[in-house]
């Protein structure tokens, strides 16, 4: 882990928390909270200027732990008076699985909280699955999150807080945007989070430690591909257009063949990896014909297929394929030249497995509706 693991957050922490015991600080309006942990150096510089801290102090806010003395006592007071806070909040709750997986509940938006999942591996790797939205607009038939409706986009601070505020934060080797929400539907916040994770002034992670999963929003996917070098995971689940649309309404707007055509224009043979997520359902998409159609769809790409066991969420007729069928599907793809593996199911006993995240309602509130 880089030595500057908490550079930007701890630097801001020193600035803001230093004022907490300062009797000269004015009373802060508790309703005005402006988190700093989701800001880029340029944005932090703007904050410094806005509260009359010398312009040069904006950069140390983002890059230095020990040099926060560059912020005067009065400067720290002015930060607090303007409503700025670190924005680092502990999880509201956590639930541990028998397999070591831990599900965390965080404050969300729109009357909903959100969940993230810590997944440790025996080989020392540790992955955090983060959420980007409260609820989701995609309405996939097999996903609990989609059934909650859409309640709002998380801010950059709320996303990065999931990563920085769990007890195992320093142990993380990977972050995957596979929690609640569609990342490309909240792309500005997701891109800012990736910048914070990968930039030298931030946590200095390699982009290879980050994977973004998407249903295939083509404009958002193109922008993500152009602006980052992170790994990409595409939720396919069926290569048959009619069947996929029944499972994933997004197919109507962004046909999977057009998504794959876009991906063929990018290099996934070297540093960046492309994977395809494919949940198997008994008698739906687990047949030899389904396998062959999927293999044809993926020709000309360097995609690897992650076969995912279905975790029933109730309220539908979908059933998981047997282990034997999963293995036959995997072996058949491998025989056709498509690398395929079966993803190990983690956290199912605490409703933390793929497709099972739902968050919690803080109060009764209808789903958010975009203004027409």
Regions found by a protein language model. Give the residues of each.
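Auxiliary Fe-S-binding modules of radical SAM enzymes
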Residues: 1-111, 264-273, 280-372
